[in-house]
């Protein structure tokens, strides 16, 4: 089975090696030629139940297929679970000119990486299995053992590689089953966002166990074409750019603080990322531009450029109705500490008089307060109502 994966990954030389040489080059034998624990897991048996895959069409529905790995060699369990998942994972045809591109409802590389993560980072001393639940176009992989010390859902994308079983992770990488050590989570994020799906979810649940969630579905051909038209092109697969773009689409704007949270990087790193993305172009215009009228302190704030907004209009519809606009305004005011009609006009695309009307209505409902009693004069703006007592006079 290992040779099958190696051939599939184009590693013909390693696939044709003798058994002893293969094990040695995979790092699965010690100096005396004896199998390591990782080697035993992969090619002999798992100490407890390994993988358990279940397929359902809808949440709560009857299972239509199940693969119980038991304690068979992990490489066999992995092959059978991945094969079952591949059969159940819808293949969607995306027309592009005179050709059609085929994409799985859950991108194959993200699907594989989620399962790899569920076996390389799990607690193999636990009697619980790694449970792979495939419901519709959604995948969840729950593995026993919580996050290792220092790792949280808020830093898992950028945390230095820290596999629970390093030799197992290295062997699976060398066999072509996993990405190079330390970029598996990045790969899941890239594969999902690049076709318009939500970013993967990561959580520690009671047990403790770690759960990875992939929310697939029909790929977004507009998003795929949009990313392919970025200049420079190579940034279309840049994890930081994809995370920034995802945040802009869902929130309408971001600054260094929001970028830091979205990319899971420091403020200094986020400033560099935004500076780099400022130079990216799409459709003859900038991908992101500074928000007009917004103070540059404590940090610059950005929105999508006009060309990008036109291309991604179908994903920005929430900001075209009154509820979406009000939510954006209040989020901006709370995060930035103030909001003006110039900022609202630039963020939502409405005229300045209408932006002023929106702000007045929010103030009348007690959600905003004016920066001074009389709504006149240059620099007049609004503050979040909850922060009225801490505001400083102009």
Regions found by a protein language model. Name each.
Residues 1-128, 134-140, 145-162, 175, ...:
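Active-site helix-to-loop segments that bind/position phosphate- or nucleotide-bearing substrates
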Residues 84, 243-251, 328-336, 347:
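Short amphipathic alpha-helical elements of helix-turn-helix/winged-helix folds
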Residues 155-195, 230-238, 242, 265-275:
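ATP phosphate-binding glycine-rich loop and adjacent ATP-lid/helix-beta elements
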Residues 220-243, 305-332:
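Short alpha-helical segments that sit at the start of domains
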Residues 250-262, 335-348:
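Short acidic, hydrophobic short linear motifs in intrinsically disordered regions
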Residues 254, 274-294, 363-374:
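A short, conserved structural fragment
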Residues 263-277, 284, 350-361:
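Short amphipathic alpha-helical interaction segments
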Residues 289-323, 373-394:
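Short, cationic-aromatic polyanion-contact patches
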């Amino acid at each position: 089975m290992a040779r099958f994966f190696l051939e599939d990954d184009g590693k013909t030389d390693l696939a044709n090696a003798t058994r002893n040489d293969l094990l040695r080059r995979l790092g699965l034998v010690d100096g005396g030629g004896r199998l390591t624990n990782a080697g035993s897991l992969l090619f002999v048996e798992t100490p407890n139940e390994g993988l358990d895959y279940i397929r359902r069409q809808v949440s709560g529905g009857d299972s239509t297929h199940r693969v119980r790995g038991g304690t068979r060699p992990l490489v066999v369990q992995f092959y059978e679970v991945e094969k079952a998942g591949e059969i159940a994972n819808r293949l969607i045809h995306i027309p592009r000119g005179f050709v059609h591109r085929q994409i799985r409802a859950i991108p194959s590389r993200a699907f594989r990486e989620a399962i790899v993560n569920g076996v390389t980072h799990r607690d193999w001393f636990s009697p619980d299995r790694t449970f792979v639940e495939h419901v519709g176009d959604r995948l969840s992989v729950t593995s026993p053992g919580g996050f290792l010390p220092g790792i949280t859902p808020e830093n898992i994308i950028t945390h230095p590689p820290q596999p629970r079983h390093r030799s197992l992770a290295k062997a699976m990488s060398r066999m072509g089953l996993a990405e190079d050590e330390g970029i598996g989570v990045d790969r899941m994020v890239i594969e999902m966002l690049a076709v318009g799906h939500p970013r993967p979810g990561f959580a520690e649940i009671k047990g403790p166990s770690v759960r990875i969630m992939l929310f697939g579905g029909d790929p977004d051909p507009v998003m795929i074409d949009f990313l392919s038209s970025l200049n420079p092109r190579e940034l279309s697969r840049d994890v930081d750019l994809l995370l920034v773009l995802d945040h802009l689409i869902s929130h309408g704007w971001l600054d260094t603080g929001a970028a830091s949270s979205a990319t899971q990087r420091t403020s200094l790193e986020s400033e560099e990322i935004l500076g780099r993305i400022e130079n990216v172009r799409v459709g003859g215009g900038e991908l992101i531009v500074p928000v007009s009228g917004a103070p540059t302190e404590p940090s610059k704030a950005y929105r999508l450029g006009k060309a990008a907004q036109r291309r991604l209009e179908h994903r920005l519809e929430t900001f075209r109705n009154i509820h979406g606009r009000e939510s954006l305004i209040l989020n901006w005011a709370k995060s930035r500490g103030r909001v003006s009609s110039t900022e609202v006009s630039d963020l939502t695309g409405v005229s300045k008089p209408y932006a002023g009307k929106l702000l007045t209505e929010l103030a009348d409902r007690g959600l905003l307060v004016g920066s001074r009693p009389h709504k006149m004069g240059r620099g007049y703006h609004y503050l979040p109502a909850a922060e009225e007592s801490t505001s400083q006079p102009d």
